[in-house]
Regions:
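His-Asp-centered acyl/peptidyl-transfer active-site segments
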Residues: 7-124, 158
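Short amphipathic alpha-helical segments
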Residues: 2-3, 60-63, 170-174
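Active-site catalytic microenvironments for nucleophilic, acid-base chemistry
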Residues: 1-8, 50, 176-179
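Extended, hydrophobic beta-loop-alpha segments that form or line the acyl/peptidyl-thioester binding
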Residues: 14-21, 74, 127-182
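Short strand-loop-helix active-site module centered on a catalytic nucleophile
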Residues: 1-2, 70, 166
Length: 182
């Protein structure tokens, strides 16, 4: 999607570097003595992933090969002095992908989604906070049973990505999803 967008704009198309955000509760990595079920607050892990293929199967293989659900990167980048300084030399990703998982909504009569839930959520990043990514794409699967949909929220910096840029990226996103399911 990103490479195609860059290509359409006549820009160089190096393999894109994404920041992937996961839930950060990698309980399976710890022995049975550790219980994080009563931990308060949101835990997340963010790690970079360079995607040099357009084949969804190869992307899946890349993701499953990442050890420790990605939490290792944060430990190496921020907690160890010897690796933190080396990793800090590299440019970070411009695009964040955050899959929030599945949420049951509606019932057996079909999908029901209260679109009013998102009316107060701005597509712009929080104005009082520092912004790490030019574009953040949050995705979740909503529904139950056979009535499930993928819902996304796109948050971008308008000084960097225009509405037409976002619209073009959303079209390419939709086309990529259609290729995957057909």
């Amino acid at each position: 999607m990103v490479s195609r967008w860059r290509q359409d704009r006549g820009q160089p198309t190096p393999p894109p570097l994404f920041a992937l955000e996961t839930h950060g509760r990698a309980d399976a990595l710890f022995d049975g003595d550790m219980d994080t079920s009563e931990t308060v607050g949101l835990l997340s892990a963010i790690y970079p992933l360079r995607v040099d293929t357009g084949d969804p199967r190869q992307v899946r293989e890349l993701l499953t090969a990442i050890p420790g659900d990605g939490i290792d990167y944060g430990l190496l980048r921020y907690m160890r002095g010897d690796t933190a300084s080396r990793l800090a030399e590299f440019s970070g990703p411009q695009l964040l992908l955050n899959y929030l998982g599945r949420a049951e909504v509606g019932g057996t009569s079909g999908l029901w989604l209260d679109r009013g839930l998102l009316t107060g959520v701005s597509p712009l990043p929080e104005p009082e906070l520092a912004v790490r990514y030019e574009l953040s794409l949050l995705a979740t699967v909503l529904g139950s049973g056979d009535h499930q949909v993928l819902v996304t929220q796109w948050r971008a910096l308008p000084d960097i990505l225009s509405e037409s840029d976002i619209a073009a990226l959303q079209i390419l996103w939709t086309q990529a999803l259609e290729e995957i399911v057909t």
